[in-house]
Amino acid sequence: MAKDTVEILIEGGSATPGPPLGPALGPFGINMMQVVEEINNKSADFAGMKVPVKVSIDRDTKEFEIEIGTPPTTSLIMEELGIEKASHEPGADIVADLPIDKALKIARMKFDSLLANDYKAGVKEVMGTCVSMGLSVDGKDPREAQKDVDAGKYDDVLVE
C-alpha cells in the first residue's frame, strides 16, 4: 500500500480541476471532481485566502485523504484588517494598525501551527509578522507591543 502526498496552496473554497491542482493530481488517476468538491467543502471557511492543502493518495486503491491547513499568518492579518497588500517599506511605511484583540484572534486560529506554548507567545509571533508587513499593533511599533505583552500590559485581553 504505497501512499503519495501532494501539497499545494489553493484559494479557500474555490479549487478547480485546473492548475495547480489538476497537473499535480492528474498522474495519480483519481476522481478530480471528488477531490475538488471535498477541498472546497473543507476550505469554505477560508474563502478568499490561500490555504495549504495536503492530499494523500493510495496508489493501489485510488483512495485519497485531504487535510486543510490554516492560511499563512500574513493572509489572516490582511483578511482581518481588510488590506490587500503589506508595506513595500516595512520599516518606514505603516499601512495599517492591528488591534491586540485581533492579534489574539489570529493567534488562536493559528495556535496549532505556531511554535508558541501559550496564547501570549502566539500573539507575540503574530506581532513579529506585523513587523515584516509594515503594520503597527495598537498604534505602536510591534516590537514595542511585544515588550508590553512581556510586561503584562495586555494580560486583561490575553486571557486563555
Curated annotation (Swiss-Prot):
Sequence ranges of Basic and acidic residues compositional bias: 138-160
Region annotated Disordered, chain positions: 137-160
Any single biological process term in GO: translation
GO cellular component: large ribosomal subunit
Protein name as annotated: Large ribosomal subunit protein uL11
UniProt keyword Phosphoprotein present: no
Keyword Transmembrane helix tagged: no
Gene that specifies this protein: rpl11
Protein family membership: Belongs to the universal ribosomal protein uL11 family.
InterPro entries listed in its UniProt record: Ribosomal_uL11, Ribosomal_uL11_C, Ribosomal_uL11_C_sf, Ribosomal_uL11_CS, Ribosomal_uL11_N, Ribosomal_uL11_N_sf
Gene3D superfamilies linked: Ribosomal protein L11, C-terminal domain (1.10.10.250), Ribosomal protein L11/L12, N-terminal domain (3.30.1550.10)
